Swiss-Prot record:
Disulfide bonds: none annotated. GO terms for biological process: pectin catabolic process. The active site is at R262. SMART domains: Amb_all. Belongs to the polysaccharide lyase 1 family. PANTHER family: PECTATE LYASE 18-RELATED, PECTATE LYASE 2-RELATED. This is Putative pectate lyase 2. Ca(2+) binds at D182, D206, D210. Residues 1-23 form the signal peptide. GO terms for molecular function: metal ion binding; pectate lyase activity. Its cofactor is Ca(2+). Keywords: Calcium, Lyase, Metal-binding, Signal. It comes from the Eukaryota. The lineage of its organism: Eukaryota, Viridiplantae, Streptophyta, Embryophyta, Tracheophyta.
Length: 384
């Protein structure tokens, strides 16, 4: 029965994937009528997206569903790619993200923003790169610390460098002395209701995305990751018991070539890893320590040709305790000898509220579901 089901799924995928993937990569004129990715199907069919950008805030799924970003604020347009960490100018990205009021931040044109120190975000902000090619690169990158309700969509963050010690403004009324940052693309500390969607990540000094210090209610979706060592860290220390509250959804991402480990690496909290594509990790794909709960559902794993690197999972510094950790696989597809080592007993089903739930497809559909991962080519008046 199981083999018959997989055969049917494969035939359906073969029949539809060609035209659908072509549509997804087009210049915005067409899009499949029944786009199965529930986030994209929420907004991408509307050619007038640029007239109602804030509708995107209704489209998240999973634990970060309630992130509203700047939905209830005004539109702010970045016109100036320069940066001053202490006294940012109006028109710059930093001037927008430090404001106390909600803002939906867009970009007047294509730009590469080289930050002079870490970009510290305030609550209720959306960075929306649709309609422009926006890169944050070659300097320190983004810090989300002690805040809530942040959406980052449609930008490229790459080649991030450590931030130096110095004074950095975090609000209109506060400038603080910072000790420096690690060189992550996005570092999330003690924050909640965060959604990172349709971004590109690569080649940073430290991690690409870190979710730390009891951060929770986070969704990381539709992103493209490539050419990096330590990709995604959920909890930075086994002794941080507060990370037990961490709830993170990782869905519809493409973990592409040149990645080594941590897709993600989890401590103590809960990770729902659903409908992601993994290509030839060089150490492991999903790892953890300190008794995290991990539910791998409907993913597509392609192992490297190295016979020593076929296992998807890795328990780190665990002794024999790992056998009771709840790590499960369901509806996953394993290619080129890839395999997942499950453990533990009891349910691992994510405790989503009604609005947070989303359909998770069989792993055989993941190449289709993730075909538009990364920033989209969006033009006003056309379907993205």
């Amino acid at each position: 029965m199981a083999s018959l089901f997989l055969t049917i799924i494969s035939l359906l995928f073969a029949a539809f994937s060609s035209s659908v993937v072509e549509a997804a990569y087009s210049n915005g004129y067409t899009i499949p009528k029944l786009l199965p990715n529930p986030i994209d199907s929420c907004w991408r069919r509307n050619p007038y997206w640029a007239s109602n950008r804030r509708a995107l805030a209704d489209c998240a799924v999973g634990f970060g569903k309630s992130a509203v970003g700047g939905k209830y604020g005004s539109i702010y347009v970045v016109t100036n790619p320069s940066d001053d960490p202490e006294n940012p100018r109006p028109g710059t990205l930093r001037y927008a993200v430090i404001q106390s009021k909600p803002l939906w931040i867009t970009f007047a044109r294509d730009m590469v923003i080289v930050l002079r120190n870490e970009l510290i975000m305030n609550s209720y902000k959306t960075i929306d790169g649709r309609g422009a090619k926006v890169e944050i690169a070659y300097g320190p990158c983004i810090t989300i610390q002690h805040v809530s309700h942040v959406i980052i969509h449609g930008i490229s963050i790459h080649d991030c460098k450590p931030g130096k010690s110095g004074r950095v403004r975090s609000s209109p009324t506060h400038v603080g002395s910072r000790k420096g940052s690690d060189g992550d693309a996005i570092a999330i500390f003690d924050s909640s209701h965060i959604w990172i969607d349709h971004c590109f990540f690569s080649r940073c000094q430290d991690g690409l995305i870190d979710v730390l210090h009891a951060s929770t209610a986070v969704t990381i979706s539709n992103n493209y990751f490539t050419q990096h060592d330590k990709v995604m860290l959920l909890g930075h220390n086994d002794n941080n018991v507060e990370d037990k509250i961490m709830r993170v959804t990782i869905a519809f991402n493409h973990f592409g070539p040149g990645l080594i480990e941590r897709m993600p690496r989890v401590r103590r909290g809960y990770a729902h890893v659903a409908n992601n594509r993994y290509e030839k990790w060089q150490m492991y794909a999903i790892g953890g320590s300190a008794d995290p709960t991990i539910f791998s559902e409907g993913n597509y794993f392609v192992a490297s040709d190295d016979p020593s690197k076929k296992q998807v999972t890795k328990r780190i510094d665990s002794g024999y305790d790992w056998k009771r950790w709840k790590w499960r696989t369901s509806k996953d597809v394993f290619k080129n000898g890839a395999y997942f080592v499950p453990s533990g007993y009891g349910t691992v089903t994510p405790l989503y509220g009604r609005a947070e739930r989303f359909p998770v497809s069989h792993g055989s559909l993941v190449p289709l579901l993730t075909s538009s991962a990364g920033p989209l080519h969006c033009y006003s008046g056309r379907i993205c």
